[in-house]
Swiss-Prot record:
CDD domains: PsrB (cd10551). GO terms for cellular component: plasma membrane. Residues 34-63, 75-106, 107-136 form the 4Fe-4S ferredoxin-type domain. [4Fe-4S] cluster 2 binds at C53, C143, C146, C157. It is a peripheral membrane protein. Pfam families: Fer4_11 (PF13247). Keywords: 4Fe-4S, Cell membrane, Electron transport, Iron, Iron-sulfur, Membrane, Metal-binding, Repeat, Signal, Transport. This is Tetrathionate reductase subunit B. [4Fe-4S] cluster 4 binds at C96, C116, C119, C122. Residues 1-28 form the signal peptide. It comes from the Archaea. Probably composed of three subunits: TtrA, TtrB and TtrC. The lineage of its organism: Archaea, Methanobacteriati, Methanobacteriota, Archaeoglobi, Archaeoglobales. It comes from Archaeoglobus fulgidus (strain ATCC 49558 / DSM 4304 / JCM 9628 / NBRC 100126 / VC-16). Gene3D superfamilies: 3.30.70.20.
Length: 207
């Protein structure tokens, strides 16, 4: 049972990077795709992921592409990392009036800054609160899973996690298959029909 919910705010100051602005694409083989898995039992709220994301993607201070929520449940505290779920049926894509938000064949949901008019329709449509209007660019912004780093490197949040609470890889990867097969993997807000492709394990009573 969910007792309380508190957002953990983490402010990163004077961290500047332009690494996350590319539109890089890579080719998948045999219909494989990338997925993101979070093991809540391994997260203790250190926020290394939040800081790494901000540095890698030049996220404005006070805004977040990834964040960590703290829940008190059944006498224990659970830290739950949140990001864009890169859904298979993304409501944000359907809501965009100019087709600036799109889904790639690799499974990512991305935003074309050159097309986005900053109307906010996609922000309102996202059931996960994963989008915001970038105050510098004036366009919608969100997690890209550091697509400019893949496949040579992992997303910054995954690479920086000291407990390996975040896992990112192809569905065919051994590590991903093992986690999804041995643990009770769930998605958030499945009832929305968005078909999210971010999976959580060791999670109970959190949306």
């Amino acid at each position: 049972m969910l007792i309380s919910k508190t957002l953990i705010f983490y402010q990163v100051v004077n961290i500047v990077s332009q690494k996350g602005s590319g539109k890089r694409r890579w080719k998948m083989e045999n219909g494989d795709r990338y997925v993101y898995v979070v093991d809540v039992s391994k997260c203790y709220g250190c926020l290394s992921c939040v800081a790494a994301c901000a540095a890698e993607n030049n996220v404005p201070v006070g805004y977040f592409r990834t964040w960590v929520e703290r829940y008190a449940m059944n006498g224990r505290v659970a830290f739950v990392p949140k990001i864009c779920n890169h859904c298979d049926n993304p409501s944000c894509v359907h809501a965009c009036p100019v087709n600036a938000t799109y889904k790639t064949e690799e499974g990512l949901v991305l935003i074309d800054d050159e097309i986005c008019i900053g109307c906010g329709a996609c922000i309102q449509a996202c059931p996960y609160g994963a989008r915001f209007r970038n105050p510098v660019k004036g366009t919608a912004d969100k997690c890209t899973l550091c697509n400019h780093r893949i496949p040579e490197r992992l997303p910054a949040c995954v690479e920086s996690c000291p407990t390996s609470a975040r896992v990112y890889g192809k569905m065919s990867d051994k590590a991903v298959k093992e986690i999804l097969s041995k643990k009770n993997a769930v998605v958030l807000k499945a009832y929305t029909g968005n078909e999210p492709h971010t999976y959580y394990v060791s999670l109970t009573g959190v949306e």
